[in-house]
Amino acid sequence: PRVRRQRQMCIRDSKFILFHDGEKVKVARGVNSLQTTTQDKGDAWKKIKMVEVMDMIQTDIRTTAQDSYIGKYANSYDNKCLLVTAIKGYLVGLEQSGILQAGSSSVGIDLAHQEAYLQSVGTDTSKMSQQEIKEANTADKVFLEASIKILDAIEDISLNITI
């Protein structure tokens, strides 16, 4: 597409395009082919950079868990906390590298899933505190949850100048 409007229409349609700006060839926008978003997969899933970061985080955490935790530690609350601390440290490193928004990362035991598991194996959780649910024996299962905010690339700049 030769004109800006045509490029914008292609981007809107999730087309990856290159263009020449008069000096060099550039990527119009780092989008992938995803067109339909869902509640779970919003607009961030349309961006190549965002998906690459999500894939990297998933791969790094999975590899660390497999290499350093699975089968090597007893599934105690203290050892779950060690795993949580390791993941949090990794996420803070990504914040410091400018990949994640500073101060946005959290990780901890997924209380809802842990409680559901306990109930599924016959444990009455109705009188348990949140801390007791966190510390409860979950056999060989670890239920964690995390929240992050991935920083996108600068793509649109608006500058209003008043004279």
Regions found by a protein language model. Name each.
Residues 15-163:
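Structured, hydrophobic secondary-structure cores that serve as assembly/anchoring elements
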Residues 1-11:
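Single conserved hydrophobic/aromatic residue that forms the stacking wall/gate
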